[in-house]
Each structure stands twice: as structure tokens, then as C-alpha cells.
């Protein structure tokens, strides 16, 4: 069962759930709290590698990822990031989120953006119990026109689902957690699997 808006507000008030900066009450509706787009992005430079062998030796995977992933792009205030048709880019939420050990979060893109071809969180929309940090967004433009994305715009909504108990291995206590305390548009760390 997911938390309703009243419970989200109560959990934020009690510090059981942390979203910084905290969304205003008008951005907490039904069963979700809105999240906004941050100003950090990364793009893929596909022309620098023919392919990435995801099951290859770790050093080769790392080398390929370093060739295809751009440095972090930090947009100045008021600037837009343009995502062209068929492009994949990483971005980050403006908000940092901290979940307790007994709650799993779910991030969904906005329907209004999907109707324009924007996929906000391509496949990985689960936020693990014990998570702390910004959420990296995997953008894909499946539409026909470039999309201008501006930091601060509402990009998605988080819902929160209490579990049957506390996780024995929440994300913040796992030694193998690749994205623990994530800040910025962190690229794939698939080679650490």
C-alpha cells in the first residue's frame, strides 16, 4: 500500500522521509510528491565507440564507458538543455531524497511529458529502501522534435510504499552500493557488478 498525500506530509513533518528541498504542499497530491529537474546532465558520444560489450572484462567496459560518456554538463540558471529525437541523456533531480529502511520509492515521469515523447526514467524507477541522494534520470526522446528541458521544471513524481518490515540490507548499509550518496548525473557503473 502506498502512502497517500496526507501521510507523505506527515512522514516529512516527522522526519521519517526526507526530501530536500521539501516540496510545497501543492506539489504533494493523491499518492505522490513532485520532483523537479536539476541542472546537471551527461550525454552519450556514440561516435567514440562502435559498441560496449557489457559482459566484457571490467577494464574494457570502463574504458568504453569513459569514451562514450561526456563530462558533466552544468547549466547556468535560465538555460535549457536540448534533447534531440533518438538521444539518451542522464540528468538529476533537484531534490535529494532519503528513504527509511522500511520504504521503497517509485519514480514516474509525467504523463504530459510522455505524450511529447519524453521518457524520464527509462527502466530503473525503483528507489531502494535506505536510499540517500539525488536521483539520476535516464532521459530518452522518442518524439519527432527536440525538447527543451529547463532546470526547476516538474519532471516526475515520487510515491512511497511501506514494506512488510525493515530491509536487512538497505541501500545505505550495503558495501556494494554503487550509487550510495549520489550527487550529480552519475554515469553507469555496470562494471562494478
Curated annotation (Swiss-Prot):
Task: Tell me where the signal peptide lies.
Answer: none
Q: What metabolic or biological pathway is this protein involved in?
A: Pyrimidine metabolism; dUMP biosynthesis; dUMP from dCTP (dUTP route): step 1/2
Active site at which residues?
Answer: 138 (proton donor/acceptor)
Subunit info here reads: Homotrimer.
Q: Which organism is it from?
A: Proteus mirabilis (strain HI4320)
- What is the protein name for this chain? dCTP deaminase
Cite a single Pfam family from the UniProt record.
DCD
Q: Where is the composition biased (Basic and acidic residues)?
A: 170-179
Q: What does this protein do?
A: Catalyzes the deamination of dCTP to dUTP.
Which protein family is named in the record?
A: Belongs to the dCTP deaminase family.
Reactions catalysed, as given in the entry? dCTP + H2O + H(+) = dUTP + NH4(+)
User: What GO molecular-function term can you cite, just one?
Assistant: nucleotide binding
Q: Which gene encodes it?
A: dcd
Q: Which residues bind dCTP?
A: 110-115, 128, 136-138, 171, 178, 182
Quick one: where's region Disordered?
165-193
The keyword Metal-binding is assigned to this record: no
What keywords appear on the UniProt entry? Answer: Hydrolase, Nucleotide metabolism, Nucleotide-binding
Its EC top class is hydrolase
Q: Which GO terms describe its biological process?
A: dUMP biosynthetic process; dUTP biosynthetic process; nucleobase-containing small molecule interconversion
**EC number in record:** 3.5.4.13
Cross-referenced HAMAP family, in alphabetical order?
A: dCTP_deaminase
Amino acid at each position: 500500500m502506498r502512502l497517500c498525500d496526507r501521510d507523505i506530509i506527515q512522514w516529512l513533518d516527522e522526519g521519517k522521509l526526507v526530501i530536500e528541498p521539501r516540496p510545497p504542499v501543492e506539489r504533494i497530491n493523491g499518492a505522490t510528491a513532485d520532483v523537479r529537474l536539476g541542472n546537471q546532465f551527461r550525454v552519450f558520444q556514440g561516435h567514440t565507440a562502435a559498441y560496449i560489450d557489457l559482459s566484457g572484462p571490467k577494464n574494457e567496459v570502463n574504458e568504453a564507458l569513459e569514451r562514450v560518456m561526456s563530462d558533466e554538463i552544468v547549466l547556468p540558471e535560465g538555460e535549457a538543455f536540448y534533447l534531440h529525437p533518438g538521444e539518451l541523456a542522464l540528468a538529476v533531480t533537484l531534490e535529494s531524497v532519503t528513504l527509511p529502511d522500511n520504504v521503497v520509492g517509485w519514480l514516474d515521469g509525467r504523463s504530459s511529458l510522455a505524450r511529447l515523447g519524453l521518457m524520464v526514467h527509462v527502466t530503473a524507477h525503483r528507489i531502494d529502501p535506505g536510499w540517500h541522494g539525488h536521483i539520476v534520470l535516464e532521459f530518452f526522446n522518442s518524439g519527432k522534435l527536440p525538447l527543451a528541458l529547463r532546470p526547476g521544471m516538474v519532471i516526475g513524481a515520487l510515491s512511497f510504499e511501506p514494506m512488510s518490515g525493515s530491509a536487512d540490507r538497505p541501500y545505505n548499509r550495503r558495501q556494494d552500493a554503487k550509487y550510495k550518496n549520489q550527487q550529480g548525473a552519475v554515469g553507469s557503473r555496470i562494471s562494478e557488478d
